[in-house]
Amino acid sequence: LEFSRVLFRSKFVSEFLQKQQIKKQFGTYLSPAMVEKLQKNPELLALGGESRELSIIFTDVRGFTSISEHYGKDVQGLTKIMNRYMTAMTAKILENNGTLDKYIGDAQMAFWNAPLDDADHAKHAVKTALQMLGSLDAFNKEVAAEGVPPFGMGLGINTDTVVVGNMGSSQRFDYTCLGDGVNLASRLEGQSKPYHVAMVIGPKTNEYVKDTYFTLPLDCIAVKGKKEGVNIRSEEHTSELQS
C-alpha cells in the first residue's frame, strides 16, 4: 500500500512538472487554451526537430520613419506605441491558434500547424492576416486622436514543408521553424511594398484557400535558389497598401 502511495505521488509530481515545463516552454508562443491542450495531451508534442507543412506569416510596419520622427528623442513614447501595436497584432495570432515565433524589430513571425495539428492552417493564416489589417484600422483611429501618424503593414504568407522544433544552443533555444518555405514567406512580405498591396500570398497557400478567399494574381517573381518563378497573389480586399 505504501509503495502504491509513493508511486502515485511520484506520478503526480512528474505530471505536474511536465505541465509546468510545457507552460514555461510555450506560454509566450501560444494562447492559454492551446497551452492547456498541450498540457492535457503531451504526447502530441514532438520537441525534436520534425518536418511539417506549416503556413507562415511575416509582418512588417510601413511608415515607421514618420512614426519615429513624430516621437523624436522621446524613446519611451516610441517604445510604448510600438508595444501597443505589437500587442494588438499578436492578439489576432493567438486568437486564431497561431504560434508566435518571434519579434524582429518592428516585424513579427508566426506559423500554424505546429506544435498542434491544424488541418486548416492556410485558411487560419489568411484569416488572421485579414483580422490584423482590421485591427490596424481600429488602432490607427485610436492613435490618430493622440496625433500619431498612421501605421501601415505589409504581410507575406507562405505554405510549405519546413523543419520545426526546439533550435538554438545549449544555453538557449526557441521553438521555431526554418527552411526555404520560411525564407520565401519573408520575401513575400518584402514584395508587398513594390506591388502596393498589404498582403502577398504564395502559391500553395492560395491552393488551400482559393475556395474560401478570392485572390488576385500579382506576378511571377524570380526567387534565389529556385529554377522556376513563383506565382504570387494578393487577397482581393488588400489590393491597396495601407501607408
Regions found by a protein language model. Give the residues of each.
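Alpha-helical scaffold within the catalytic cores of cyclic-nucleotide enzymes
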Residues: 81-98, 114-155, 159, 180-193, ...
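Helical mechanochemical/support elements of P-loop NTPase systems and associated helical scaffolds
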Residues: 22, 34, 78-81, 85, ...
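Catalytic NTP-binding/metal-coordinating core of nucleotidyl cyclase/transferase enzymes
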Residues: 45-127, 175
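A structural signal for short, well-ordered beta-strand segments
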Residues: 56, 108, 153-159, 232
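Cytosolic regulatory/linker segments at or just downstream of nucleotide-handling modules
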Residues: 162, 191-235, 239, 243
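Regulatory cytosolic signal-relay segments
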Residues: 5-52, 66-69, 73-76, 80
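Cytochrome P450 core scaffold surrounding the K-helix E-X-X-R motif
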Residues: 166-169
